[in-house]
A protein has these predicted regions:
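Signature of short aromatic-glycine-proline-rich micro-motifs recurring in repeat-based ectodomains
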Residues: 44-51, 97-101, 145-149
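Sec-dependent signal peptide recognition
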Residues: 2-9
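Surface-exposed loop/turn elements that mediate protein-protein interactions on large endomembrane-trafficking
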Residues: 20-42, 73-89, 121-140, 173-183
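C-terminal motif of bacterial Sec signal peptides marking the signal peptidase cleavage site
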Residues: 15-16
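Beta-strand-rich domains and repeat architectures in extracellular enzymes and scaffolds
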Residues: 38-72
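Short beta-strand elements that form the blades of beta-propeller/WD-repeat-like
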Residues: 58-67, 103-115, 121, 150-169, ...
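Blade-loop segments of beta-propeller domains
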Residues: 81-117, 133-145
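Asp-box/WD-like beta-propeller blade repeats and closely related beta-sheet repeat scaffolds
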Residues: 124-166
């Protein structure tokens, strides 16, 4: 009996002390390569919400939000050309209001944050409103989905920062949303 316990102990110790890392380290290296993207006259070049999105086929897009016209632009990262854009409706049955920030899970699941509302909207590439998730108990505040603080999804939970109005409110500075239970 003692041998079984000792064997289990060493097996547990061996597994827990494994040097295998689930995620490898990455390193950025400076290159002489320049990425240049042409923008049209309707697009402001002072955007602060941007990210890189890789689709299921491995194609990479540089994405950014044009706050002025409620649009998310997708540029082919390799060809450095506009690929497509999505412009969610602000009003109506598919309305999401004025967006400020987004998280692209895939082109059928694009989460957008409303600038004036404490909630999260789920749309697809065609801008169909699929779901709305209000953040109960929070006053309307500005969600801070900026390039320096993008929403992050880990398994079934989406984490994002918000900018509470500390002068008059006591809202939290971040929100975690379980995408399955919507809590």
């Amino acid at each position: 009996m003692k041998k079984h316990h000792l064997l289990l102990f060493f097996l547990f110790l061996f597994i827990s002390c494994s040097t295998h890392k689930k995620y490898g380290a990455c390193e950025l290296k400076e290159t002489d390569e320049t990425l240049s993207f042409p923008i049209d006259s309707d697009t402001k070049n002072n955007f602060n919400i941007y990210s890189v999105y890789k689709d299921k086929d491995g194609k990479e897009y540089f994405t950014f939000q044009n706050i002025e016209n409620n649009t998310i632009h997708f540029y082919d990262l390799k060809q450095q050309k506009p690929a497509f854009r999505i412009t969610p409706s602000q009003e109506g049955s598919n309305g999401v209001g004025r967006i400020f920030g987004y998280y692209i899970q895939n082109l059928d699941s694009i989460y957008v944050f409303n600038f004036y509302d404490s909630g999260l909207y789920l749309i697809n590439k065609n801008c169909d409103l699929l779901d709305k998730q209000p953040f109960l108990g929070l006053k309307p505040s500005c969600f801070m989905a900026t390039a320096s603080q993008l929403p992050v999804r880990i398994e079934h939970t989406l984490y994002t920062c918000i900018e509470p109005n500390r002068l008059i409110e006591h809202d939290p500075v971040s929100v975690a949303i379980n995408m399955n239970t919507k809590e």
